Amino acid sequence: MYLEDIVKALNLRVVSGEERLTAEVLGGYVGDLLSDVMANSKEGDLWITRQTHQNIVAVASLKDHAGIILIQGCNPAADTLDKARKEGVPIMVTDMPGFEAIGKVYNMIATKKGPDPST
């Protein structure tokens, strides 16, 4: 599953990192506590959050996330956008509430990967 597929399917507004929409999304992570995201998210994850400050860019870059989705119409702060553009981190915005956005992203990724062989 590629980031551009999720952007199109969910009609996400891309505010930075347009050049990286071809990144492969390997999984997802949901969280607003940066230490939790740093400890538990993985490379290639699509991070879903309400946080809008510039530290989200640092975490996404450090963890090599596929991108960040900001939910409930949260727009990134100006310094966040500047940093994301400089570092090429894709940030997308949706008006969807978190539960809906998470469910849709999960279904897209799970369907693309196929059934879990461990179940």
Indicate where each model-derived feature is located.
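N-terminal, charge-rich interaction modules
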Residues: 1-18
